[in-house]
Swiss-Prot record:
Pfam families: ATP-grasp_2 (PF08442), Ligase_CoA (PF00549)
Family label: Belongs to the succinate/malate CoA ligase beta subunit family.
Entry binding sites for Mg(2+): 199, 213
SUBUNIT field: Heterotetramer of two alpha and two beta subunits.
InterPro entries: ATP-grasp, ATP-grasp_succ-CoA_synth-type, ATP_grasp_subdomain_1, Succ-CoA_synthase_bsu_CS, SUCC_ACL_C, Succ_CoA_ligase-like_bsu, Succinyl-CoA_synth-like
Residues reported to bind ATP: 46, 53-55, 99, 102, 107
PANTHER family associated with the record: SUCCINATE--COA LIGASE [GDP-FORMING] SUBUNIT BETA, MITOCHONDRIAL, SUCCINYL-COA SYNTHETASE BETA CHAIN
Organism per entry: Ehrlichia canis (strain Jake)
Entry cofactors: Mg(2+)
Domain ATP-grasp: 9-244
Details of cofactor binding: Binds 1 Mg(2+) ion per subunit.
Name under which the protein is recorded: Succinate--CoA ligase [ADP-forming] subunit beta
Keywords: ATP-binding, Ligase, Magnesium, Metal-binding, Nucleotide-binding, Tricarboxylic acid cycle
Binding site residues for substrate: 264, 320-322
Length: 386
């Protein structure tokens, strides 16, 4: 689960990380009150969307007067931002964050992420802040320092020193950055976050370190332990089909292709998307119905797929605990309930797959069955291309 920048900064401040003073604005009627809370000649107006790249898209504006700030807020609220992290349709700006300007001497990057390969938390630090860390890692890998924290021992003082060892930083700078690294590590553990990122972490002329921008992503599977964090969820920033899918235990991710996919199992779903691309088409979604799909979930899965503009649907089911004949009956019932006006190719394998295939073939419905995944993908791609 993602949250907005202003929410991430509020969490960081609770753990002792310094952030600029700011105020959130949802409508023009709140602007004067928000500006009055700030005591700075420079006001930064920031669009609050769940995507990076806001600055280049006009979503971050530095204003030197209240009138400039008001004009920027008026232009920004209700507008649509298109960045490299949004879809081509962009995201609507429903709220903006006003922040006091900051005296910037130097920009750094620091983050904590879950390192699944090492089963540890990795702290990443760079003296090159304010840009994508992937770009820095590509052009100047020596400037990106990674320190892995064993959860058995937690963050130790030497971890902070190791982060700054080759960065030509003073003892005071090292101490302050180490302190921030320890704090974001505590944020990770305390909130079950997958990622805590400060970019840029700025050093002011007075030697203070401030989180100028922040991003936190939480583990959805651990949200039940954090009702306070669940309250931060902004459904307006999420894809409505993904929200609807979660109500029925479906794992759905919208994509930009034109062939809808319904699969059981995440690995099989990814393989299905790969083979669709192999035959020259693009998947419209990732959809894992799980191992206990019922007629109801299959029906809802079809509805969610068809809510997007798809030219065809590929159903790929492996019957293990879930028998293929039950799935076939669910598919038939779902099609009879909701009219599917696009080509549908179904591949069944596993327990009772012969019976399931026969049920589909004998149903008199417009269903094309396939014997294996390659045949199924080839068929749906070629039908859609005609």
């Amino acid at each position: 689960m993602n949250i907005h920048e202003y929410q991430a900064k509020h969490i960081l401040s609770r753990f002792g990380v310094s952030v600029p003073k700011g105020a959130i604005v949802h409508s023009l009627s709140e602007v004067d009150d928000a500006i009055s809370k700030l005591h700075s000649k420079v006001i930064v107006v920031k669009a609050q969307i769940h995507a990076g790249g806001r600055g280049k898209a006009g979503g971050v504006v530095v204003c030197r007067t209240s009138d400039e700030a008001k004009a920027s807020i008026k232009n920004m609220l209700g507008s649509t931002l298109v960045t490299h992290q949004t879809s081509k349709d962009g995201q609507k700006v429903r709220k903006v964050y006003l922040e006091e300007g900051c005296d910037i001497k130097k920009e750094y990057y620091i983050s904590a992420i879950v390192n699944r390969k090492q089963s540890q938390v990795s702290i990443i630090f760079s003296t090159e802040g304010g840009v994508d860390i992937e770009e820095v890692a590509s052009t100047s890998p020596e400037k990106v320092i990674v320190c892995n924290i064993d959860p058995l021992f937690g963050f130790q003082s030497f971890h902070g020193r190791n982060l700054c060892f080759d960065s030509n930083l003073s003892l005071d700078q090292t101490r302050k950055i180490s302190d921030i690294a320890e704090k974001i590590y505590k944020v990770m553990l305390s909130t079950d976050a997958n990622q805590v990122e400060i970019n840029p972490l700025v050093e002011t002329s007075s030697g203070n370190f401030i989180a100028l921008d922040a991003k936190i992503n939480f583990d959805d599977n651990a949200l039940y332990r954090h009702p306070d964090i669940q309250e931060l969820r902004d459904y307006d920033e999420e894809i409505k089909e993904e929200i609807e899918a979660s109500k029925y235990g479906l794992n759905y991710i919208k994509m930009d292709g034109n062939i809808g996919c319904m699969v059981n199992g995440a690995g099989l779903a990814m393989a299905t998307m790969d083979i669709i691309k192999y035959y020259g088409a693009e998947p419209a979604n990732f959809l894992d119905v799980g191992g206990g799909a019922s007629q109801k979930t299959v029906t809802e899965a079809f509805k969610i797929i068809l809510s997007d503009k798809v030219d065809g649907i590929l159903v790929n089911i492996f019957g293990g605990i879930m028998r293929c004949d039950i799935i076939a009956n669910g598919i038939i019932a779902a099609i009879e309930e909701i009219r599917i006006n696009v080509p549908l190719v179904v591949r069944l394998s596993g327990t009772n797959f012969e019976l399931g295939k026969k049920l589909l073939d004998d149903s008199s419905l417009n269903i094309i069955t396939a014997n294996d995944l390659s045949e199924a993908a080839y068929n749906i791609v070629n039908i859609v291309k005609k």
